[in-house]
Amino acid sequence: MPASKPLLIALLGPTASGKTCLALQLAEQLKLSVLNVDSRQLYIGMDVGTAKPTKEQQRRVQHHLIDLRRPDQPITLQEFQAAAQLILAQKLREQNMPFLVGGSGLYLKALTCGLRPPAVPPQPELRKQLGELGQRTCHHLLQAADPTAANRISPADAMRTQRGLEVVYATGKPITTQQGSSPPPWRVLELGLDPHNLRERIGHRTTQLYANGLIEETEHLSHCYDTDLPLLQTIGYGEALKVIQGLLNREQAIALTTRRTQQFAKRQRTWFRRQHHPYWLKGEEPLSEALSLIQAGLR
């Protein structure tokens, strides 16, 4: 890896793979701050359901790109990229190594590969109309307008489905034909976590999310915002909302959240395999393995 450009580290992997724990260890060892690349952790008040780093963890290690907006104020990929690039530029000026951590593949790629997403601002009135149509209809519309995007986006992902339609209706072109790229001014070392016992880890974490107050957090969010809010239909929040509405009991919600999370993790694995080329940390000591790779990358 030529050392002509500064080094950026990215720690990626599917949900529940242990990224937060390893990120804290690496950040403390190397005296780094963390740039969040989890799309739901960008929103204020969505703490339990996104497994956002706790206040104590954020005191231990500085975190950026967390709690940027309220859940009813969507952040586009371009807006995220612009906010992240300001912090990255600051880190590079200070000669601090940027450290990205997260599992939102497209957001990671926007920073590591220099994607240029279309500059289409959110369209609140259109999103309201799409919300009234329902996610099933919206995904069918996206399938007709931009099959490539529809095949990449889960039929349950209302936020990304609406964004895809928003771009089509605003520009007359599919979003997938408008995403150019330009090489970023840094080298990238991608480290990947994908433990063999991921299914068990997902089951344990889902149970823990409910024990930590996911239903109560969802109830609070549903009082603050419309229950049709796309973020309240995402994994965990959607099932917790059904408990509040009397459509599921707690055990059913945990089982459904676990299943949806496992399906999501499978899609994440596919994305990382096709779109990224990380060094997969396979040993029993991921911290020491990661430190060795970082030291080698700095030479």
Swiss-Prot record:
Names of the cofactor(s): Mg(2+)
Name the record gives this protein: tRNA dimethylallyltransferase
Location of the region described as Interaction with substrate tRNA in the Swiss-Prot/TrEMBL record: 38-41
Function: Catalyzes the transfer of a dimethylallyl group onto the adenine at position 37 in tRNAs that read codons beginning with uridine, leading to the formation of N6-(dimethylallyl)adenosine (i(6)A).
Keywords: ATP-binding, Magnesium, Nucleotide-binding, Transferase, tRNA processing
PANTHER family named in the record: TRNA DIMETHYLALLYLTRANSFERASE
Pfam families attached to this UniProt entry: IPPT
Record field: catalytic activity: adenosine(37) in tRNA + dimethylallyl diphosphate = N(6)-dimethylallyladenosine(37) in tRNA + diphosphate
UniProt-listed HAMAP family: IPP_trans
GO BP: tRNA modification
Site positions (Interaction with substrate tRNA): 104
Binding site for substrate: 15-20
Subunit and partners: Monomer.
Family: Belongs to the IPP transferase family.
EC number(s) from the headed UniProt entry: 2.5.1.75
InterPro entries: Dimethylallyltransferase (IPR039657), IPT (IPR018022), P-loop_NTPase (IPR027417)
Binding site for ATP: 13-20
Any GO MF annotation of the entry: ATP binding
Gene3D superfamilies in the record: 1.10.20.140, P-loop containing nucleotide triphosphate hydrolases (3.40.50.300)
Domain of life according to the entry: Bacteria
